[in-house]
């Protein structure tokens, strides 16, 4: 998905895997639909935004292509593998951690939006949309 918005070769996420923390860098593949002519964009996030959605939001945020609006994300920056022990017993093991291109750990509290929506003060679910529209019309 990130390849649709980011130039070819842009670092989307850094993965550190294994006991030696081998770094695997994941980059875009160059299908950039907008070819640098991306209109203003807002990405809405909340505590339910996890894993791949955090990776995409973080990549767009760090590249300056989107303003992230909402509340801090879940913080699911880990990769698990399922090891079958028996037919009825499995063990889920964390085998890697994800970091944004700039080295921000997705697991450490999730992503912080550029514009925070105060959920306590929100009068309706439209508060999220109102915040996004305000960013887009400034």
Name what the model sees in each region.
Residues 106-107:
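Generic structural signal for well-ordered beta-strand positions
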Residues 6-8, 36-41, 51, 55, ...:
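Extracytoplasmic
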């Amino acid at each position: 998905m990130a390849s649709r918005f980011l130039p070819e070769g842009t670092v989307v996420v850094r993965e550190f895997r294994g006991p030696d923390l081998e770094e695997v860098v994941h980059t875009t593949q160059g299908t950039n639909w907008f070819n640098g002519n991306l209109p203003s964009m807002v990405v809405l996030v909340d505590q339910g935004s996890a894993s791949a959605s955090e990776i995409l939001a973080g990549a767009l945020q760090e590249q300056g292509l989107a303003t992230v609006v909402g509340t801090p994300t879940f913080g699911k920056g880990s990769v698990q593998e399922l090891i079958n022990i028996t037919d009825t017993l499995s063990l889920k093991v964390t085998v890697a951690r994800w970091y944004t291109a700039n080295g921000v750990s997705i697991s450490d509290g999730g992503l912080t939006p550029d514009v925070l929506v105060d959920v306590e003060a929100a009068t309706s679910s439209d508060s999220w949309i109102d915040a996004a529209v305000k960013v887009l019309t400034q």
